[in-house]
UniProtKB/Swiss-Prot annotation:
This is Suppressor of tumorigenicity 7 protein. Pfam families: ST7. One of its GO terms (cellular component) is membrane. It is a multi-pass membrane protein. The gene is ST7. InterPro entries: ST7 (IPR007311). The lineage of its organism: Eukaryota, Metazoa, Chordata, Craniata, Vertebrata. It comes from Nomascus leucogenys. It is found in: Membrane. Keywords: Glycoprotein, Membrane, Phosphoprotein, Transmembrane, Transmembrane helix.
Length: 585
C-alpha cells in the first residue's frame, strides 16, 4: 500500500513538473485574452495613441543618445564579463543561465533513480577532484640555505611563495613534533621554532635549543653518572635543531651534510630509545612515531646531499637501505629520488625494476613514474626513429609502444613536454607540487631534462608525438582516456605555489566565449554608427538610403540566388549537362 502511494505521489509530481514546463504558453494566451476583454475600461486605444504621438515628437538626437547609452552599458557589461572570465575561467552570464535559469525552466531531471545515480557519480567525481587537487611534498625539493637563498642573493627574486613555505611549516610541525614535547625544554623551543615566520628567528631558536641541551648535560649528568657514553645516552642532542640549521643556515651542501650527520647521531639515539618504550602507552607511541619520521627525513636528506656532491652510488645505496628499513613510509616518495639517481648512473635495468614495483594501477601516479616509463620505451627506438620513414612504412611495434607511453605520460601531465623541449624557461622547483599541474612539471623537468638529453633521439620522438595526445582527449575536463578527467583546480593551486614572475602553464587553453566576442563586436559597431550619425546626420542618411536601395534591388536578389545555387551545386557535385550533337563542330 505504501509503495502504491509513493508511486502515485511520484507520478503526480512528474505531472506537475511537466505542466509547469509548458504553463507559460497558457499564461501568455490568458494575458492576451484579458487585454482584449479589458481594452475599453483600460483605454488601451487612447494610451496607444498617446504613446505614438510621443514617439513621433522625438528628435534624432534622442535616438542617438539612447543608442550611445545602450552601447555604454553594453561595454560595461563586456568589461565585467572579461574580468570574470580572466579570474574564474567561465562566462558569468553562461554560469547564471546554466545554474539558475535552467532549473526554473524545467531542465532538472527529477527522477529519483536518476538523481541517486547522478548524486553518487557527483560524489565520486568530487572525491576524485579532492584527491587530484591535493598538494604533495616535493620529493626532490632543494635546500633553502644552500640553494634557494643563493638564488635570491644572485637574482634578488624570491623562488618560494608564502603559501608554499606555510605548507612546509605545517609539514614540519606534523613530522617533527608530538604532544610530549613540552616535557623537554629543547623540543619545546623547537615546537615554537617551526611556527616562526622569520627565518632568522627560527635559526636563533635552533641555536638556543642546542645551547639549553648543552647546559643541562653539564649540570645534571655528573649527578647521575660520570661516563661520557652514559652522558650521551641520557641527554642526546636535539636532532630537529640540527635539521633546521642544515636546511636554512648552511650555505653549501657540504655544510648541510655535516649538520645532517650530527642530526643522525642524535636522531638514531632517540629512535632506539623510543622504540623500546613505544608499547608503554599512547604518549610513547606518538613519540616513537615522531622519532621515526625524524630519522627517515635525516637519512633521505643525507642521501640527497650525497647525490648533489656527486657520490651517486653511495646515494643509491642509502636510498635502497632506507626503503628496506622503512617500507611503509611512502609519504616521502623515496622511490622517486631513487629513480633519478639510477638514471644518472644510466642503470636502466634497475630503473625498470623500480618501475615494475611502483608503476601499478593501484598506486598513485606521478610525472616521474609516467615520464620515466616513456623514456625507457623511447630509448629502445629513438636512435633510429625518423618521422619521414615512419610516415612511409608506418610505426613498428616498439615505436607504437613508445608513442603510447608518451601519450600516457602527456595525458597525466601535459605541461612537462614544453619544459623538456625547452619551449618554456625553467625556474627552481617549489617545495610542494600539485600532481598533473605546472608545479609538478617544473619539479620533474628540473632534474630529468639532462636524462632525456642523454638518450639520443628521445627528445626528437617526444617533439614529434606529444601533441597527438590531445586528439584522443578533445574534452580533457570532461573525460580522460587512461586517467581521470583533468582537474579544473590546477591553475589556481599552481598560482599559489609558484612565484609571481613565472608564467603559469594553463591546460586546456581557455578561449574567449563566443558571447563575449559577439558582444564586443556589436557594441563597437553600434557605438561607431551612433557617433557617425551624430556628427554627420545627412551623410549617414544618404548612406543608409543607398544601402537599403542596394539590398532591395532586383540585381542583388538575382546575384544572391545565383550564389546560393552555385554553393548547392558545388556541395552536390552536379555534373554538367551533355552537349547536343547538333552543336558539335
Amino acid at each position: 500500500m505504501a509503495e502504491a502511494a509513493t508511486g502515485f505521489l511520484e507520478q503526480l509530481k512528474s505531472c506537475i513538473v511537466w505542466s509547469w514546463t509548458y504553463l507559460w504558453t497558457v499564461w501568455f494566451f490568458i494575458v492576451l485574452f484579458l487585454v482584449y476583454i479589458l481594452r475599453v475600461p483600460l483605454k488601451i486605444n487612447d494610451n496607444l495613441s498617446t504613446v505614438s504621438m510621443f514617439l513621433n515628437t522625438l528628435t534624432p538626437k534622442f535616438y542617438v543618445a539612447l543608442t550611445g547609452t545602450s552601447s555604454l552599458i553594453s561595454g560595461l557589461i563586456l568589461i565585467f564579463e572579461w574580468w570574470y572570465f580572466r579570474k574564474y575561467g567561465t562566462s558569468f552570464i553562461e554560469q547564471v543561465s546554466v545554474s539558475h535559469l535552467r532549473p526554473l525552466l524545467g531542465g532538472v531531471d527529477n527522477n529519483s533513480s536518476n538523481n541517486s545515480n547522478s548524486s553518487n557519480g557527483d560524489s565520486d567525481s568530487n572525491r576524485q577532484s579532492v584527491s587530484e587537487c591535493k598538494v604533495w611534498r616535493n620529493p626532490l625539493n632543494l635546500f633553502r640555505g644552500a640553494e634557494y637563498n643563493r638564488y635570491t642573493w644572485v637574482t634578488g627574486r624570491e623562488p618560494l611563495t608564502y603559501y608554499d613555505m606555510n605548507l612546509s611549516a605545517q609539514d614540519h610541525q606534523t613530522f617533527f613534533t608530538c604532544d610530549s614535547d613540552h616535557l623537554r625544554p629543547a623540543d619545546a623551543i623547537m615546537q615554537k621554532a617551526w611556527r616562526e615566520r622569520n627565518p632568522q628567528a627560527r635559526i636563533s631558536a635552533a641555536h638556543e635549543a642546542l645551547e639549553i641541551n648543552e647546559i643541562r648535560s653539564r649540570v645534571e649528568v655528573p649527578l647521575i653518572a660520570s661516563s661520557t657514553i652514559w652522558e650521551i645516552k641520557l641527554l642526546p642532542k636535539c636532532a630537529t635543531a640540527y635539521i633546521l640549521l642544515a636546511e636554512e643556515e648552511a650555505t653549501t651542501i657540504a655544510e648541510a651534510e655535516k649538520l645532517f650527520k650530527q642530526a643522525l647521531k642524535a636522531g638514531d639515539g632517540c629512535y632506539r630509545r623510543s622504540q623500546q618504550l613505544q608499547h608503554h602507552g599512547s604518549q610513547y607511541e606518538a613519540q616513537h612515531r615522531r622519532d621515526t619520521n625524524v630519522l627517515v627525513y635525516i637519512k633521505r636528506r643525507l642521501a640527497m646531499c650525497a647525490r648533489r656532491l656527486g657520490r651517486t652510488r653511495e646515494a643509491v645505496k642509502m636510498m635502497r637501505d632506507l626503503m628496506k628499513e622503512f617500507p611503509l613510509l611512502s609519504m616521502f616518495n623515496i622511490h622517486e629520488n631513487l629513480l633519478e639517481a639510477l638514471l644518472e648512473l644510466q642503470a636502466y635495468a634497475d630503473v625498470q625494476a623500480v618501475l615494475a614495483k611502483y608503476d601499478d594501477i593501484s598506486l598513485p601516479k606521478s610525472a616521474t613514474i609516467c615520464y620515466t616509463a616513456a623514456l625507457l620505451k623511447a630509448r629502445a627506438v629513438s636512435d633510429k626513429f625518423s618521422p619521414e620513414a615512419a610516415s612511409r612504412r608506418g610505426l613498428s611495434t616498439a615505436e607504437m609502444n613508445a608513442v603510447e607511453a608518451i601519450h600516457r605520460a602527456v595525458e597525466f601531465n601535459p605541461h612537462v613536454p614544453k619544459y623538456l623541449l625547452e619551449m618554456k624557461s625553467l625556474i627552481l622547483p617549489p617545495e610542494h607540487i600539485l600532481k598533473r599541474g605546472d608545479s609538478e612539471a617544473i619539479a620533474y623537468a628540473f632534474f630529468h631534462l639532462a636524462h632525456w638529453k642523454r638518450v639520443e633521439g628521445a627528445l626528437n620522438l617526444l617533439h614529434c608525438t606529444w601533441e597527438g595526445t590531445f586528439r584522443m582527449i578533445p574534452y580533457p575536463l570532461e573525460k580522460g582516456h587512461l586517467f581521470y578527467p583533468y582537474p579544473i583546480c590546477t591553475e589556481t593551486a599552481d598560482r599559489e605555489l609558484l612565484p609571481s614572475f613565472h608564467e603559469v602553464s594553463v591546460y586546456p587553453k581557455k578561449e574567449l566565449p563566443f558571447f563575449i566576442l559577439f558582444t564586443a563586436g556589436l557594441c563597437s559597431f553600434t557605438a561607431m554608427l551612433a557617433l557617425l550619425t551624430h556628427q554627420f546626420p545627412e551623410l549617414m542618411g544618404v548612406f543608409a538610403k543607398a544601402m537599403i536601395d542596394i539590398f532591395c534591388s532586383a540585381e542583388f536578389r538575382d546575384w544572391n540566388c545565383k550564389s546560393i545555387f552555385m554553393c548547392v551545386e558545388d556541395e552536390l557535385e552536379i555534373p554538367p549537362a551533355p552537349q547536343s550533337q547538333h552543336f558539335q563542330n
